Design a protein with these regions (language model features):
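Flexible, processing/modification-adjacent segments and terminal tails
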Residues: 23-33, 43, 96-165, 185-191, ...
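Bacterial N-terminal signal peptides
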Residues: 6-16
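Gly/Pro-enriched, hydrophobic low-complexity segments
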Residues: 83-86, 150-246
Length: 256
């Protein structure tokens, strides 16, 4: 009976553990808040992992490097591209980005890493901070609708239905996990970048996307495949200090 189904859903939505799919997301602010509230007491504080970084060239060839990454949430990410001895990588910290090439630094410059924000930080920082970051990066949080994405229901924030050019992010409805970001290139509006978080796996009491795919104008140009993932690793604070990049190393055997 329809009325019985309705009462069942009402009862579920009034229970202590209210599932997101029983809530009507009125806008992006409500969604970002729900993401935080779902995992605020369980999401890991840090993670260390290795990745196969795969560049897909226009001629059909590819190049693979092994990178080391360390995240401390919210807002800190250290990447070593290749062996630490080569001095190549990035440090994202305190809203800035410093790039290293053969040990020489460029930056820091202001930078909000929205993949870090939406894939990780959102669960470990105040919702108001995430909302301010998203607005500051040009996402229209008043725009929200639902889509089907690879067989799953998703929320799309920042664009109207059918618009795949405006800046937008996609969130899986069931688990409230980030799955896609679409945005124009900062320097060339004819290029549309599309980043996809795939292959979510349990990590401690949270989740991590073990594969990240990058597309430009529909063509897959770069992929990241994560392995040796460890949650709640303990890091030396100097690891995220750009001035000490060349004297610190990411320890894949960091204590948990």
């Amino acid at each position: 009976m329809r009325w019985m189904v309705g009462l069942s859903c009402l009862a579920a939505c009034l229970s202590a553990a209210v599932p997101a799919n029983c809530q009507e997301m009125r806008d992006g602010e409500a969604l970002l808040t729900a993401m935080h509230d779902r995992y605020k007491d369980s999401w890991y504080e840090s993670v260390v992992f290795k990745e196969n970084a795969i560049t897909l060239n226009p001629d059909g060839t590819s190049k693979t490097e092994v990178w080391d990454e360390a995240l401390e949430l919210p807002g800190k990410l250290r990447i070593n591209r290749g062996p630490s001895s080569e001095g190549n990588g990035f440090v994202f910290a305190d809203g800035t980005l410093t790039t290293f090439q053969k040990g020489k630094a460029t930056g820091p410059r202001p930078y909000v890493h929205m993949l870090l924000v939406l894939g990780f930080d959102v669960y470990r920082q105040n919702p108001e901070t995430t909302i301010d970051q998203a607005k500051g990066q040009g996402f229209d949080l008043t725009q929200i609708h639902e889509e089907k994405w690879e067989g799953q229901d998703v929320y799309v924030v920042g664009a109207a239905k059918g618009d795949l050019k405006s800046k937008q992010f996609w969130i899986e409805k069931k688990r409230l996990l980030f799955v896609r970001l679409i945005a124009q290139d900062e320097h060339d509006a004819t290029k549309i970048h599309d980043t996809r978080f795939r292959d979510y796996r349990r990590l401690s009491t949270g989740w991590i996307s073990a594969r990240v795919e990058f597309y430009t104008n529909g063509k897959n140009t770069f992929n990241e495949d994560y392995f040796d993932m460890k949650a709640n690793a303990k890091f030396d604070p100097a690891l995220f200090d750009p001035t000490r990049f060349n004297e610190t190393r990411i320890d894949s055997d960091a204590k948990q």
